[in-house]
Amino acid sequence: FLPATRATPKELLPIYDTPALQFVIDEAAQAGCTRVVIVTSRAKPSIENYASAASTDKVAVSVVYQDSPLGLGHAVTCAHQAVGNEPFLVLLPDEIMGDASLTKQLIALYEKSGKSSIGLKRVAVAEVSNYGNVKVASGASDASSTDSSVAILQVVEKPKPADAVSDIVIIGRYVLSPKVFEKLEQIKPSSNGELQLTDALAMLASENALVGVVSEITRYDTGTPMGLLRAVIEIALERKDIGPQLNSWLKEKFNK
């Protein structure tokens, strides 16, 4: 996203007129959260400034720092003191969902099962190397029903397509038990020095303590240029203030 991210962190790049980070804050609030903790770098003071302005009477937004970019598992560990020993959500701001329905489902699944619950989707096997890949309980991987809950047996970080354990992958929505902090303390850094959250999830899966929801929710991967552009266009099309005009312009543009 250079040169834009020299001036604006990727998390604050606008999706039409709303920063990507705000979508995640709003999603958390819609799911019933009253407190949002943003894990960020000290090199991004604009995120702390944004967090201060984003707090409302319904949701308090604060910041904790990850001094080195040592992976998602490390980022979760940085929030341990703020979270305490309570279950918590992890929402990745480079994945914007069409609404809060998946997050609400994960919360309900956690409350029912008492197990860490994660968002899942199906992809072509050729794409699994871009995601954490999961093996689910027998029969569930062939389920055709939309938004089905599954027991997770195995978690593999970005396997080659030939090594895929299924066509089901992890997307950036998690409801985690505080037990995950114990697992994060036990895992070893990967070859690039990062602590992978998937390694901790794999330990939970081995203890029958991990479940998920296979969802068909609308999802925008704003961590890629094409994903960001798609999000801007599709979300703007849904807006009453600009959608009709944009729709007319697109039809005019592409009907030439």
Model-derived regions: residue spans:
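Conserved core of the sugar-phosphate nucleotidyltransferase
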Residues: 98-183, 187, 191
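Conserved N-terminal catalytic core of the sugar/cofactor nucleotidyltransferase
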Residues: 13-14, 18-90, 96-101
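Conserved alpha/beta core of the MobA/IspD/sugar-nucleotide pyrophosphorylase nucleotidyltransferase superfamily
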Residues: 136, 148-151, 165-256
